[in-house]
UniProtKB/Swiss-Prot annotation:
It comes from the Bacteria. This is ATP synthase epsilon chain. Its main location: membrane. The gene is atpC. It is found in: Cell inner membrane. It is a peripheral membrane protein. Produces ATP from ADP in the presence of a proton gradient across the membrane. One of its GO terms (molecular function) is ATP binding. SUPFAM superfamilies: Epsilon subunit of F1F0-ATP synthase C-terminal domain, Epsilon subunit of F1F0-ATP synthase N-terminal domain. The lineage of its organism: Bacteria, Pseudomonadati, Pseudomonadota, Gammaproteobacteria, Pseudomonadales. Coiled coil: none annotated. CDD domains: F1-ATPase_delta. Belongs to the ATPase epsilon chain family.
Length: 139
């Protein structure tokens, strides 16, 4: 039996996942992170994108987060995010439409243009698409 660590994924709306996992893979601000049982304690920012859990027994579950924080303690991994969705609940067509709308907004710069907000919408839509693609690849 593989070693496991307890993982909680929590959004502003409440707990989304709680259980034993063999591995957590997430996108930190400085690169990808793979957290396995026995990992050194750390706290880091997370970029928008997929979080992949390898659950006890080897099954994978993918979530989309809009960014947040990851905390690793000796017997626990905790992900705190504003928005969390199961990748299976994401609509690929809607994410592609949001990506196109964000790209168009960047091209139609006007006097009231908020580049930061447009870039954030573009990054979020691209991260949702990556999450859907990663979930499909894992099946």
């Amino acid at each position: 039996m593989a070693m496991t660590v307890h993982c909680d994924i929590v959004s502003a709306e409440g707990e989304i996942f709680s259980g034993l996992v063999e591995m957590v893979v997430a996108h930190g601000n400085l690169g990808d992170l793979g957290i396995a049982p026995g990992h050194a304690p750390l706290i880091t920012n997370l970029k928008p994108g997929p979080i992949t859990l390898t659950k006890q027994g080897g099954a994978h579950e993918v979530f989309y987060i809009s960014g947040g924080f990851l905390e690793v303690q000796p017997n626990m991994v905790k992900v705190l995010a504003d928005t969390v969705q199961r990748a299976a609940d994401l609509d690929e067509a809607q994410a592609q439409e949001a990506l196109k709308a964000a790209e168009n907004a960047l091209n139609l710069k006007g006097a009231d243009f908020d580049y930061g907000a447009a870039a954030a919408r573009l990054a979020e839509a691209a991260a949702q698409l990556r999450t859907v693609q990663q979930m499909r690849k894992g099946k």
